[in-house]
Amino acid sequence: DGKTGFLLWFQAKIYQIFLQRKKDKIMMATSPVESLSSGFIINIELFFITLLLALPLGLVITFCSMSKFKPLKWLSRTFVWIIRGTPLMLQLFVVLYVPGLLFAMPISSRFTAAVIAFVINYAAYFSEIYRGGIESVSRGQYEAGQVLGMTKTQIFFKIILLQVIKRIIPPLSNEVITLTKDTSLARVIALAEIIMCAERYTKQGLIWPLFATALYFLVFNGILTILFGWIEKKMDYFRV
């Protein structure tokens, strides 16, 4: 009715004002450096939360996609196919708007919407990396473990796991570094990350924030590259 419509409109306006003030608080900081740093913190938070949730979720999807129960197997693979076959930008819009449009359950926090979209997207990619690593181990090693009287769990953790980790580190590190750059896509749902902050100052005639933004990403990705290189070096003793 009219009252309900008015209340919904009023609630939407209040949220819009609150969101705008939150964005302005970040982008109108005391200095461009502070604004860019605040924006990059959002990128970093999105990055770490995505990794924390997507890595284990990807493993669950992997086990489902390799299950002998065919409905679960094909459901998992269809999910991965859809997620990998559609743009992450589109998935951000879907997560933010579809729950409210179809189920009257809008996601009030844009950061939460971004986290959900990124976790779903990267879990699908990680699951394929895991699956490729597991399937690359020869069947004979499973059979050898069975001959020795080991259970399936013992075979996986004592024989297979280290080989899988060794093989998936390069593609996994590539996806992780890609994730750092993909966090900038959150700006399409008005999340004030670093590129949105830099763009605001660029429109005011400052060009250096763009180079500062590149420096932020280069330094962070450089640290990740060194970290994964160290991990690979530590595992060089284990030849596969």
Language model regions located:
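Extreme N-terminal basic, low-complexity initiation segments
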Residues: 2-11
